[in-house]
Amino acid sequence: MELRTAAPEDLGKIMELIDQAKAFLKRNGVDQWQNGYPDQTCIEEDIRKGRGYLCIQDHDVAGYVCIDFEEEPAYDTLDGKWLSIQPYVVVHRLALDASVRGRGLASQVFEETERLARSREIHSFKVDTDNDNQIMKHLLEKNGFQFCGTICFDNSEKIAFEKLI
């Protein structure tokens, strides 16, 4: 699996992946992403800012992820304690094609994100998710992330994790 920076012409495929992910979350009883977020405007901003990436596997688009090296303002309001106070990378909006779910691709996305972060001398990796998203919580724990506390984001409480890399 490799990451490729998303371009405006990828928007249609990305929105397909986002819609698939929304349906997957709903089927699994997860309230996350059921209020219109992320929408096309959000993804267009990811692309414009160079933080939107396609996950390419066997020459096909297998997923989308936002990898952001800018500070997340909501993380300043953590009710808890981060592992570090150093610069960090954040993953948002991870959406995988239904055909590749359960095959370890999300873990590969995390590995590639870590590689990108280390290439920029960044050694902290943060992620947040809804408390009812058991799938993402399991993925984070499996990949060495530690629970650090809760944040308020988009008028809802999220659980926040960090991994030192």
PLM segments and residue spans:
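A short beta-loop-alpha structural element at the N-terminal edge
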Residues: 2-16
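Conserved GNAT-fold acetyl-CoA-binding loop/helix
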Residues: 22-42
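Conserved acetyl-CoA-binding loop-helix of GNAT-fold acetyltransferases
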Residues: 96, 102-115, 138-142
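Conserved acyl-donor/pantetheine-binding loop and adjacent beta-alpha core of acyl/acetyltransferases
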Residues: 66-93, 101
